[in-house]
Amino acid sequence: MSVGSRSQGLLACALSKEKLTQLFKYCFVAFINMKVRPEDSLKIENIVASAKVTDYLDLPMLASKIEGAEYNKKRFPGVVLRMQDPKIAALVFGSGKVVLTGAKSVNSLSKGLNILGDKLRELGIDIPKKLEYKIQNIVTSADLATPINLNKIAVGFNLDKIEYEPEQFPGLVYRLDNPKVVVLLFGSGKLIITGGKEPDDAKKAVVKILSDLRSLGLIT
């Protein structure tokens, strides 16, 4: 290969690397500037559900037989079972009622309840093969990705649905009827949606909030 040909080859290679570097920088900047839709920022923080597994449970016996069970009836009237996979807690009461808390997904609830059912069956307790739960509350966080003026919201929204006392609490409380949830709005644009019964309730609430804010001209 001649010196000239080699030089041209090296130049072509250098240009190729330069173009790749420019392309990488362009893609990186585009990624950083890409805005996530508020509806896509939803994150389930906690799901609380209840279930009825039997008519009676001997709590002292459960506490002594199940490894890791916590029971102090002077502090709390139930046995606390903390699971690692899924990472949830089961509050078990003598009436046979169970409260599951700490779940991050509906699947975690089902898995956790089944694990509890298996533990109780191993102790000879008659537990139905199919256990069902009822969701009591879903707490979800979201991000509008833009600061919001809580004072203007307090004036513009339906006053019957608003609670805003910045000296006592930094967020604005907004009660929705459909879906029936409570939304905590913060000046940073962060939201906490609580009271949901279905996973989609949070998304519906965010869509409603966005619509209300746009109608007031507070966001574009």
Question: Where do the language-model regions lie?
Answer:
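Intrinsically disordered, low-complexity polar/charged tails and linkers
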Residues: 24-99, 103-182, 188-190, 196-220
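Intrinsic-disorder-associated interaction segments
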Residues: 13-16, 202
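Accessible peptide chain termini
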Residues: 1-2, 34
